[in-house]
A protein has these predicted regions:
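ATP/NTP-dependent adenylation/nucleotidyl-transfer catalytic domains that generate, transfer
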Residues: 6, 155, 213-214, 226, ...
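Enzyme catalytic cores with a strong preference for nitrogen-chemistry domains
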Residues: 1-340, 358-367, 399
Length: 632
């Protein structure tokens, strides 16, 4: 459970209808198996100990007493297991029978939760408040539909349960539970199999977990339930904040994975609509200490891309449209006709010129209204210059080549800088000269021009840009896109265009090292200044951006996730080195982010100084660097 990872499971063992002791044995076997796996929350279907299809037998004292005895057996078998188990059974209270879930942990019955919305005529509504309940020799314990089971050591782990028809109720108790603080919603379902049941429930669980920023663990009845009028599939699902992590439907299903409750809390903190309280809830503690959870779930290397590469094209198409549409809106508002973009042959400027081409197309303007300006200087290579021109020409843009070498040398002379001194002045003078040219070219159009920026969010995060140089534009279409997102969109265009000349150039752009090209090339004419040698691989940078900045995880947890995702590429020491570098640059380069121009937010996170991630320009990095340095 360290770092907020909780191993959870949903199980639908084969049962016998109206045979509580047989079913208790099935539950106990599953408990033993999952305890060995380190599971901390185990969920069974509705009415596990009797079966959900007993009909009027639910009124029979014999079945009710048998279910109580079976629960006693399960509770006793849970001794020594630090695992919260939810098992279903019918319970009698006075003249009423209730569809209920028993919460069991380490030899104790912690509470009994009746269904808030019983969907079977045999079961009663629980009312607002019920007395404590005694089940056989167990209890008395709380008997209330509004209960939270809070871990004694992991404050973010609060579990609430939905029983039977609660799972699909039009006004679901899940909302109330989540607003009261439940981060894990246990759903003990009882629905039969239908042609669309798996699809329907998967969609519902995904949506519910996303809306409530919750983990959902669902188990539905499987083999052994009566087939008199229906078939039961044993559907089991585990979802987290809109993503289905595990699912199975094979009659006797069983799924296990880890939920990240820290991720859920991070999402809720940023959701201003997420307000509520637990005043009406009974809160019961469970659990003993914090253990290291062995991670079995995969963590992708590209968190800003879809999990499934098969979805890349659809995501890239949507991103491209969003970026182009945002530029169209700005140009229409300001009555501008000519987007002006500086092209370098790098991936960011390549995407920017593609976006500009798409924007003028959407506006019904000629393709040559796009002005692509390449400004070679001391570090420009033939490869990047050639690719920049080919891409722009194939898109139909007007290409201008303006060599800035002479201008920069004159500038050096004016300020008394020795051009042999290749320090930050040598580099930044080139970037600022380019920005001045692009601004002035845009201003030169009688019917309006706009300097379109190319800098992406990854470079704003690490500050790998020249202040008041490539850092500034009139509108930055890449401001909300990370480097790995930019690469995905450029690859999408390369793989879907019918223009093979364009495709070849785009693929070569993707294969070109990321570089500002501000230092002279090698003797062989190759790029000498490679960004990733200075600031680290952009795949890693985007990974750190997602978990450290976007989700607010501690460096220790971020490094653990990086080891999990990138252990096949980088050793632990290398990952730690680049994480430390990232933390340092995140703070030291904030002054550049504090004055960013407008640009679209594309994935819910940005560095906009108006609506995005905000921090002071002079904040201390000491705490973060000390946290990284303390890691082994």
């Amino acid at each position: 459970m360290k770092h907020g990872f909780i191993k959870v499971a949903a199980a639908a063992p084969e049962i016998r209808v109206a045979d509580p002791m047989f079913n208790a044995d099935a539950v106990i076997r599953a408990m033993d198996e999952h305890a060995r796996l380190g599971v901390k929350v185990l969920v069974f279907p509705e009415l596990t100990l009797t079966g959900a299809t007993c009909g009027d037998l639910f009124y029979q004292n014999t079945l009710l007493a048998g279910a109580a005895a079976a629960l006693e057996k399960v509770v006793k078998a849970s001794e020594g297991k630090d695992m919260l188990v939810f098992v279903g059974l019918p319970v009698a209270q006075g003249a009423k029978v209730y569809d209920a879930a028993a919460a069991v942990c380490n030899g104790e019955l912690l509470g009994v939760v009746p269904a808030s919305c019983p969907g079977d005529k045999h079961f009663a509504l629980p009312g607002a408040l019920l007395d404590d309940i005694q089940i056989g020799s167990l209890g008395p314990v709380d008997f209330h539909p509004q209960q939270l089971f809070q871990h004694s050591e992991v404050s973010e782990l609060n579990v609430a349960v939905l029983v039977g028809a609660d799972v699909s109720a039009s006004v679901s108790p899940a909302v109330r539970h989540a607003l009261a603080g439940a981060t894990v919603l246990v759903e003990m379902a009882g629905f039969p199999m239908a042609t669309d049941s798996a699809c329907r429930m998967t969609t519902a669980v995904r949506a519910e977990s996303a809306k409530l920023h919750a983990g959902v663990v669902l188990a539905a009845p499987g083999f052994g339930e009566s087939s008199t009028d229906a078939t039961y599939s044993g559907l089991c699902l585990i979802a987290e904040d809109g993503k289905v992590l595990e699912s199975a439907e094979d009659g006797c299903s069983d799924v296990v994975t880890e939920l990240d409750v820290q991720l859920l809390i991070a999402a809720r903190r940023k959701d201003a609509t997420f307000t509520g309280d637990a005043a009406s809830y009974v809160v019961t503690e469970w659990g003993e200490g914090v253990e290291e959870t062995v991670l079995t779930r995969p963590f992708g290397k590209y968190p800003y891309r879809p999990d499934d590469p098969a979805d890349y094209h659809a995501a890239a198409k949507r991103l491209l449209h969003m970026q182009a549409a945002s530029l169209v809106r700005r140009m229409q508002y300001a009555n501008l006709k000519h987007p002006v973009v500086g092209i370098s042959g790098g991936v960011d400027s390549t995407l920017a010129v593609i976006i500009c081409a798409e924007a003028v197309k959407m506006m019904g303007l000629p393709a040559d209204y796009v002005n692509a300006v390449t400004m070679p200087c001391f570090g420009t290579t033939d490869r990047t210059k050639s690719n920049a021109i080919i891409v722009s020409e194939q898109l139909g843009a007007t290409v201008r080549v303006i060599d800035i070498g002479e201008s920069v040398m004159q500038h050096f002379k004016d300020i008394g800088h020795d051009p042999e001194n290749r320090n930050v002045v040598y580099e930044n003078a080139q970037a600022r000269e380019r920005t001045q040219i692009l601004m002035d070219v845009a201003n030169g159009f009688a019917d309006g021009g706009i300097h379109v920026g190319t800098e992406d969010m990854s470079e704003f995060a690490d500050g790998w840009c020249t202040y008041n140089g490539d850092h500034i534009s009139m509108y930055d279409v890449n401001a909300g896109s990370t480097k790995t997102m930019v690469q995905m969109v450029v690859r999408y265009v390369a793989e879907t265009t019918d223009d093979q000349v364009l495709a070849k150039a785009l693929l070569d752009v993707l294969d070109t090292p990321v570089s500002p090209e501000l230092l002279p090339p090698t003797r062989n004419g190759e790029i000498a200044q490679k960004s990733e040698d200075s600031v680290g691989p952009y795949n890693l940078q985007d990974f750190f951006l997602y978990y450290l900045v976007d989700h607010g995880f501690a460096p220790e947890k971020v490094l653990r996730l990086a080891d999990t995702a990138y252990g096949d590429e980088f050793d632990h020491a290398t990952l730690k080195k680049w994480l430390r570098s990232y933390c340092r640059r995140l703070f030291s380069q904030q002054f550049k982010r504090s004055c960013l121009q407008d640009g679209p937010t594309l994935n819910g996170f940005s560095f906009s100084p108006r609506t995005g991630f905000l921090m002071p320009s002079d904040g201390s990095d000491a705490l973060y660097l000390a946290s990284v340095d303390a890691l082994k």
